[in-house]
Amino acid sequence: MVRAVTEKNQERALELYYDLLTLKEPPMRILFLLAKQYRQLLQVKQFGAAGLAQTEMASKLGVPTFAVRNIVSCARAYSISELEQAVRDFVDAEESVKTGRLEDKLSVELLIIKYSSKKAAG
């Protein structure tokens, strides 16, 4: 599902999200996984701008080099500023749920819709 979001495949992302909910996956866990992926996308984008090789990126992120290749591929669809905004949005969503401003399922669904949209997020 995370990959469907980062690849901007909204229909698939929502379908998989609803499947996860049916399987009783907690929405906050899904939010955590999405936030983690977007943080990695941002870090890889920043590392690339700094001229780091993918092997160095893998070492800094603590993931295998093949995983970095996948992250780099997904990161191409975003600018650094879009990824920074996404990370802020995920933090804000978590805060909204924890303070009771938004229900957890809705909060995650809204983020999936926003970031899997083909038009520019933000």
Give, region by region, the residue ranges found by the protein language model.
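C-terminal capping/gating helix-and-loop segments adjacent to ligand/active sites or protein-protein/ligand interfaces
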Residues: 71-102
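Acidic-residue sensor for enzyme active/binding pockets
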Residues: 25, 94, 109
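Short alpha-helical scaffolding segments that buttress acidic/His motifs in well-ordered protein cores
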Residues: 31-34, 87-90, 112
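Small-residue-rich helix-loop
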Residues: 1-82, 119-120
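Residues that form generic nucleotide/phosphate-binding pockets
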Residues: 60, 74, 89, 111, ...
